[in-house]
Regions:
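An acidic-aromatic
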Residues: 49-109
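Short, exposed beta-strand/loop patches in secreted or surface proteins that constitute
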Residues: 22, 48-53, 73-75, 119-125, ...
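Solvent-exposed helix/loop surface patches that form functional interfaces
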Residues: 97-136
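Sec-dependent N-terminal signal peptides
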Residues: 4-13
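Short, hydrophobic/aromatic-rich segments at coil-to-beta transitions
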Residues: 26-32, 55-61, 125-133, 152-157
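Non-transmembrane domains of secretory- and envelope-associated proteins
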Residues: 18-25, 36-38, 43-45, 66-68, ...
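N-terminal targeting signals for Sec/Tat export/insertion, comprising classic cleavable signal peptides
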Residues: 28-56
Length: 191
């Protein structure tokens, strides 16, 4: 009976760790985001589409509110550069990425890193258990709900806290794994 329980335990553990594919195997992602922020009791909702070439290139196209619709942000974290297309002025602006914008990539990389190195995190993640991750000294994220696409598990609803105070809710939808992305658009933003 003991052997059966040990074998059963090993089998269950194997299934838990095999339940989701490794996030580190993903090369590209495409998804929609609704971000609801509250800063100093001011509420704002922003919707956008993300094209992400892992590990460090992101295209964000704003779909709402109407005032910002059509704005395109291209982030090249490897070069610490950001390009912003403003349709209202029909111009492209180039600047360095500021620390707040680095939190996106930090959060994604933190989840991938924790999935690789922490058995406890991976086990809870694959079981879709809500959990908290500290991104830096001020920012933490609470993964509230998960979604599963093509055998990969992703955070679906995330609360963002700054110094313990909730500042945003982020909801991901329409997730596509390894879609073909136009690399030239992400790499040659100024052209």
């Amino acid at each position: 009976m003991k052997k059966f329980l040990i074998v059963l335990f090993i089998l269950v553990q194997g299934l838990i760790f095999a339940a989701g594919k490794n996030l580190a195997d993903i090369k590209t992602l495409k998804f929609d985001v609704v971000e609801k922020t509250t800063i100093k009791s001011k509420k704002r909702e922003l919707s956008y589409k993300i094209d992400f070439m892992l590990p460090n290139k992101i295209k964000k196209e704003v779909t709402a509110p109407k005032l910002n619709k059509g704005e395109i942000y291209l982030y090249d974290y490897s070069a610490n550069q950001k390009y912003v297309y403003l349709p209202m002025f029909n111009e492209v602006r180039e600047s360095e990425i500021v620390d707040d914008e680095n939190r996106i990539i930090k959060a994604i990389n933190k989840i991938i890193e924790e999935e690789k190195k922490s058995k406890d995190f991976k086990q809870k993640y694959n079981a879709k258990v809500a959990q908290t991750l500290d991104i830096d000294k001020q920012i933490s994220i609470n993964i509230v709900t998960y979604l599963e696409v093509e055998g990969y598990i992703f955070p679906e609803t995330v609360e963002i806290k700054e110094s313990g105070t909730k500042i945003a809710d982020v909801k991901i939808s329409n997730l596509q794994i390894n879609p073909k992305l136009e690399e030239k658009i992400l790499l040659n933003a100024k052209k």
